[in-house]
């Protein structure tokens, strides 16, 4: 299945996010954890991270999107009713092409379900 490419969010990140108040965006998001995967049939927006930087200026293996996620989830939501899921990260494949194949499969599946993908990617 296409969603097998997705790794769950880091436990420490989830703990930090859960510490935010119910007024923050984090309270409106369903997260991919080690034990649970969001039901995509009930989602309008899906966030995925891409941990790939081969081909960039820096090929460091230390990509971490936690800071971006912490900042995003500490925002305050507006008055809207869209459901959001953070589906986790696509890990680097054996090659850069493998990673982007996984991205294409995941995004294609989301779009087939009429889910808007939001991609977090750091070009280093």
Each language-model region and where it sits:
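Metal-dependent C-N hydrolase catalytic cores
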Residues: 2-124
């Amino acid at each position: 299945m296409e969603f097998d490419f997705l790794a769950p969010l880091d436990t420490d990140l989830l703990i930090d996010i859960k510490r935010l108040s119910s007024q923050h965006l984090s309270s409106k998001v369903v997260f991919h954890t080690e034990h649970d995967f969001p039901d995509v049939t009930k989602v309008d927006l899906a966030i995925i991270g891409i941990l790939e930087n081969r081909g960039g200026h820096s090929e460091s293996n230390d990509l971490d999107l936690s800071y971006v996620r912490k900042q995003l989830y500490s925002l305050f939501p507006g008055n809207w009713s869209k459901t959001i899921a953070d589906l986790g990260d696509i890990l680097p494949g054996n090659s850069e092409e493998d990673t982007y194949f996984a991205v294409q499969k995941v995004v294609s599946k989301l779009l087939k379900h009429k889910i808007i993908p939001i991609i977090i990617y750091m070009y280093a």
